[in-house]
């Protein structure tokens, strides 16, 4: 079973996305911010991470940079799911190591299609 780490400061979004992904057959872990995600990654080895960009504390771009420094996560796909639509943010996220980008609100079928491409 493929494991996905969801990182977002909205617990409502985390729970709804978790339900969608679990129904599709993924194991899901959640974190409400960058620091919590890094703590989980000390022991968790997900196949993919989905993160928001705008979170209190550590933002998503900083989180991606930190995750990519971890030897066990260097090659893990990272999908950004955010309300941000600025091209500069996309460029910054890709430079940090993001693999893909989805703008909220995301349709479940769109998310699942992207996941199948990133972690077949």
What do the predicted segments below correspond to?
Residues 25-32, 40, 102:
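Short hydrophobic/Thr-rich beta-strand motif most characteristic of the beta2 strand and flanking loop
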Residues 44-50:
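Active-site beta3 strand of CheY-like receiver
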Residues 55:
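Receiver (REC) domain active-site loop signature in two-component systems and cognate sites
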Residues 15-23:
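Charged docking surfaces used in two-component/phosphorelay signaling
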Residues 99:
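Short, glycine/charged-rich "phosphate-handling" switch motifs in NTP-dependent
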Residues 106-115:
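C-terminal output helix
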């Amino acid at each position: 079973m493929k494991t996905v780490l969801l990182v977002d400061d909205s617990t409502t979004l985390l729970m709804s996305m978790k339900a969608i992904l679990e129904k599709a057959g993924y194991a899901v872990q959640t974190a409400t911010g960058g620091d919590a995600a890094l703590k989980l990654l000390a022991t968790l080895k997900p196949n993919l991470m989905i993160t928001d960009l705008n979170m209190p504390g550590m933002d998503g771009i900083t989180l991606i940079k930190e995750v990519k420094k971890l030897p066990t996560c260097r090659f893990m796909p990272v999908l950004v799911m955010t309300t941000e639509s600025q091209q500069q943010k996309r460029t910054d996220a890709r430079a940090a190591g993001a693999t893909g980008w989805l703008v909220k609100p995301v349709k479940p079928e769109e998310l699942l299609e992207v996941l199948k491409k990133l972690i077949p």
